[in-house]
């Protein structure tokens, strides 16, 4: 998980827009890194339709007072079509893994894309 922490620190420095993590055997590994130009749509398109993942996304937005801000989201992606055993593994490991990533501001759990739409992300950020 050291590499996960390292990449997360780089995301906080705005080197990456997002990171997708997967559980490989007993450990969490980095599966994909999104460059700063990538959008939220690029990010959601990178999540598999039928497998669980953890992800962090650095969300830039404008407040109602017209201030530019960003918030780091932790997303637990657990689609309905994924295997029950994997859902349980991801659910039981989530809090421990999330604690390793210092600086997460918003947590979101999603079982289908509508639960993590751009509008939902924006409303949770404000």
Swiss-Prot record:
It comes from the Eukaryota. GO terms for biological process: actin filament depolymerization. Keywords: Actin-binding. PROSITE patterns: ADF_H (PS51263). Residues 1-126 form the ADF-H domain. CDD domains: ADF_cofilin_like. InterPro entries: ADF-H, ADF-H/Gelsolin-like_dom_sf, ADF/Cofilin. One of its GO terms (molecular function) is actin binding. Preferentially in mature anther. Gene3D superfamilies: Severin. The keyword Transmembrane helix does not apply. Actin-depolymerizing protein. Severs actin filaments (F-actin) and binds to actin monomers. Belongs to the actin-binding proteins ADF family. This is Actin-depolymerizing factor. It comes from Brassica napus (Rape).
């Amino acid at each position: 998980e050291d590499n996960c922490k390292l990449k997360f620190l780089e995301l906080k420095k705005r080197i990456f827009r997002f990171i997708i993590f997967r559980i490989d055997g007993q450990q969490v590994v980095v599966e994909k890194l999104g460059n700063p130009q990538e959008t939220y749509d690029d990010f959601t398109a990178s999540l598999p339709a039928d497998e669980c993942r953890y992800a962090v996304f650095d969300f830039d937005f404008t407040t109602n007072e017209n201030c530019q801000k960003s918030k780091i989201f932790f997303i637990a992606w657990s689609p309905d079509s994924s295997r029950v055993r994997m859902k349980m593994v991801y659910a039981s490991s989530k809090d421990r893994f999330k604690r390793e990533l210092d600086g997460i501001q918003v947590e979101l759990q999603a079982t289908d894309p509508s639960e993590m739409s751009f509008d939902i992300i924006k409303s949770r950020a404000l």
